[in-house]
Amino acid sequence: MSEVKLILDDCLDAMREMEADSVDAIITDLPYGVTNCAWDAVIPFAPMWEAVKHVLKPRGAFVTTASQPFTSALVMSNLQWFRYEWVWEKSKGTGFLDANRRPLKAHENVVVFSDAATDYNPQMEKGTRHHRGQRAQSKPTTVYGKFTHSLEYSDERFPKSVMRFAVQERAEHPTQKPVALYAYLIRTYTNVGATVLDFTMGSGTTGVACVKTGRNFIGIELDEGYFDIATKRIAEARMQLPLLEVT
């Protein structure tokens, strides 16, 4: 069973007290600063990165959802660590009050940082099946030269940078993300038994996804109300473990 540790505290203070190089990945949902709510206040970048570098193992991934203009500000705060982004395409758009002036927004960013190449377990997708035995050979290019390795096609496809997950219908936090999205990210950037940190835990979605995928979890949350919600959700997920397939 996954080990779970939940901390009610300021995330920067709590992370400074943690052991150095103690987590395999940080997978979180940082506040974007798009509202005046206390829970949406942007964490100062300089002390945040200092804390991240303290707790994250070398080559560990720091993955967070984001949205413009916060995405650009976050990337520029540590361009050296920035690797790439995904786009999460939502099942529903937002911004109906401005629908006559701009398109409905139906996506968010998922931004990946690391000090070096990270663990990456591509979650293969099913595509159109090619005839077995069909092979391809590329033409010479000015960049790589002639590629002579023969490829045998199958129905497995590597993931593309656009992910499609339905939005959370019954949410206990205003920005609660779907468990399926975070389980996907956890499987992609960690292996079974790894330790994942979410230092802006909110209602505990990352923790629930860790329990379902067989990862250890450390969650930090400042708001006592959301901390209690997260504690309950993660406990319920652990009770369902005999019914879950850990991957």
Predicted regions and their residues:
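Short, conserved SAM-binding/catalytic segment
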Residues: 1, 231-244
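Short acidic, low-complexity intrinsically disordered linear motifs used
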Residues: 162, 242-247
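Core catalytic lobe of class I
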Residues: 1-219, 224-229
